[in-house]
Amino acid sequence: MSSEFTHINADGNAHMVDVTEKAVTEREARAEAFIEMAPETLEMIMSGSHHKGDVFATARIAGIQAAKKTSDLIPLCHPLMLTKVEVDLEAQPAHHRVRITSLCKLSGKTGVEMEALTAASVAALTIYDMCKAVQKDMVISQTRLLEKRGGKSGHFKV
């Protein structure tokens, strides 16, 4: 673990990290999030009987779109040329929840952790949005980075 924040300069002000001199490397990040709900709500999603349509397809597209827009949402995040974004949704009826996983890849000078986290988060938020008419007390939880590869800090895996 590093002992310094990279987005704070010597004067204590927030700044975007200068990556000009960094090497271009293959980078990859995986993240996950969960959304817990009543068994009946999950069944509506799984059976396709939700009145708003295919919840998983909409959440998947929202997550992909969110990864591409991460630098518009996170102020000091660099805009990146993503080469792959994947969002998968898995119903887990035994736990009354959906597990969302994301994968982001690129060849670049900075990592894609924020893009992967944003993809998983927004997919979960989209499920909430589409299902809130049926259930308002759903819980989004355990959003975390699962793995990152590439760059100076090397490989990280939970």
Swiss-Prot record:
Keyword Lyase (UniProt): yes
Annotated residues for binding of substrate: L76, C77, H78, M114, E115
Assigned keywords, A-Z: Lyase, Molybdenum cofactor biosynthesis
Spans through the membrane: none
Gene Ontology molecular function terms on file: cyclic pyranopterin monophosphate synthase activity; GTP 3',8'-cyclase activity
Pfam families with a match to the protein in the record: MoaC
The protein's Enzyme Commission number: 4.6.1.17
Active-site positions on this chain: D129
Catalyzed reactions per annotation: (8S)-3',8-cyclo-7,8-dihydroguanosine 5'-triphosphate = cyclic pyranopterin phosphate + diphosphate
SS bond list: none
InterPro entries the record matches: MoaC (IPR023045), MoaC_bact/euk (IPR047594), MoaC_sf (IPR036522), MoCo_biosynth_MoaA/MoaC (IPR050105), Mopterin_CF_biosynth-C_dom (IPR002820)
Single GO biological process annotation from the record: Mo-molybdopterin cofactor biosynthetic process
Job of this protein: Catalyzes the conversion of (8S)-3',8-cyclo-7,8-dihydroguanosine 5'-triphosphate to cyclic pyranopterin monophosphate (cPMP).
Subunit relationships: Homohexamer; trimer of dimers.
Recorded family membership: Belongs to the MoaC family.
Name this polypeptide is given: Cyclic pyranopterin monophosphate synthase
Organism: Shewanella loihica (strain ATCC BAA-1088 / PV-4)
Source lineage: Bacteria, Pseudomonadati, Pseudomonadota, Gammaproteobacteria, Alteromonadales
Gene: moaC
